[in-house]
Amino acid sequence: MSVGFITIDEHGDIYLDPDTPPVSNPNFIEEIHRNLRLTEKFGLLTEFHDEEYIVESFDHPLHIIAIEFKEKKIFLQTKQNTLFQADNSKWSVDEWDRFNGLTTSYSPFVLTEKAQAQLFNLADSYDDEGFVADNEYIATPPYYIDSPQIESPQYWVNVYQSEGNPGWNLNEAAEAFKDMLPRIKFPKSRILVLGCGEGHDAAFLARAGHLVTAVDFSKEALARGKEKYKDLTNLHFFESDIFQLPQDWNFSFDVVVEHTCFCAIPPDKRSDLVRLYRRMLHEEGQLLAVFFAMEKRSGPPFGSTEWEIRKRTEQGFHYLFWGRLRNSIPSRMGRELFVLAKKKKD
């Protein structure tokens, strides 16, 4: 089967082509919804008219507008009137107190405000940890699953040493940067690469003539990068926790690069990371980013939605470009979001 793309916007509307109106045929919607499934790489696929499609969903793909409790089961109705049953072991709540979860067919959903209000009205009781439906307690843990070990530099050293070539290490610059940098045509810039790993993105930018500072707190990754790219005199590797960068770096970079850092840190530090982007950039500075948009609660790498990424960045940045990449490497196809954004003035 050939592979195409289907887009689901922030309201849950489905598009076969972003330049045409959303799909309105109930049978088509039903088919697309029913065939939704998570891949092993935590992307989304569906089938429609015997063809397979990668699903690019701005938020969790199923937007639930109504719920029903019946015989210890919870039934969900999408805005297009497709009906699903919730997997009562897969509920969670995000940082913005939105309830979400998986259906019994393993499709991700999020409750609209209307549906969430209805849930509270129907529940026998509820507390900060969950709710009771038909005398059954349904836990709603935080969406992201805590992984405290990732805050230790030794954890990352161990991964590099045990795996040799960790899954995030492409041994080359990200396809997005190779594709987009010639189009953007930055003038010679001071660029900061956060969580640089072995420095492949940083080296690519340095070879394009920029003055690049690459930061990581894995000694192993930095040692590899320094050896591999020792010929680049305009590339400087710096060992540090990104949240402990020198104060005299503040407001001194033209561009901050994000690629596999946002997904690698504890998700409860993501807003701190966005503030760090802004702190490192001068008033006209820009964020050059590849984020992972995928349905993955554990990590690293932790997933995120475009909804979350926008929620965290919209107060601090003007978006110059925002879009999914369709020239990714196969293992990342449909899950990479390219963002170019300019720092908002205080």
Over which residues does each language-model region extend?
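A conserved beta-strand element that flanks and buttresses the S-adenosyl-L-methionine
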Residues: 257
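Terminal leader/tail segments of proteins
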Residues: 1-148
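Class I (Rossmann-like) S-adenosyl-L-methionine-dependent methyltransferase catalytic domain
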Residues: 148-249, 265-346
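Conserved acidic residues
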Residues: 254
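Short catalytic micro-motifs in class I SAM-dependent methyltransferases
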Residues: 260, 264
